[in-house]
């Protein structure tokens, strides 16, 4: 396969601004999907979910976290991250998203593989993640590396904004 993209870690004061457009695209897609599924105009009318979503970016950039992007030429076409959790052995994978125009090229798998390797290097022994129930392709990707369904976990983003019932929770030992 001819790979025309690369995975790189972001850090520093400008990292959040670099990924903000892709994070915005991902959040807008999720919220639009929920609104359509529920027949609602908005599922986040007061912006609670949006504020929580963007506040997490600093946890990806802090100690024990990681923020990766996939670039095709100079365009960021994918993103993935992990953050530390309530215990020192567990990381939570977050914000795995590949733009529709770049899907099917192996970017999501490359991002996930790098996140898992980096989490191991940080000393984590397991990763957890939450994904919306409608994201069946994501479920298949995570299950292909051995992730298994678990009960909802404390501190989950979806649980904190009332979407636990529309979320699949997964865990993978490293």
Question: Where do the protein language model's features map onto the residues?
Answer:
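Structural signature of beta-strand start/N-cap positions in the alpha/beta core
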Residues: 66, 125-126
């Amino acid at each position: 396969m001819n790979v025309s993209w690369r995975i790189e870690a972001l850090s520093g004061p400008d990292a959040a601004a670099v990924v903000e457009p892709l994070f915005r695209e991902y959040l807008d897609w999720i919220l639009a999907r929920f609104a359509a599924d529920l027949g609602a105009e908005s599922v986040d009318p007061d912006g609670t979910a949006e504020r929580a979503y963007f506040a997490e970016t600093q946890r990806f950039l802090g100690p024990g976290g990681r923020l990766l992007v996939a670039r095709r030429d100079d365009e960021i076409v994918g993103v993935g991250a992990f953050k530390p959790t309530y215990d020192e052995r567990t990381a939570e994978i977050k914000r795995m998203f590949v733009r529709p125009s770049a899907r099917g090229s192996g970017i999501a798998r490359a991002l996930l593989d790098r996140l898992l390797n980096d989490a191991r290097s940080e000393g984590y022994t397991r990763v957890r993640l939450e994904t919306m129930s409608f994201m069946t392709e994501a479920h298949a990707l995570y299950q292909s590396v051995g992730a298994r369904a678990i009960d909802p976990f404390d501190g989950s983003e979806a649980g904190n904004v009332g979407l636990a019932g529309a979320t699949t929770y997964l865990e993978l030992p490293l």
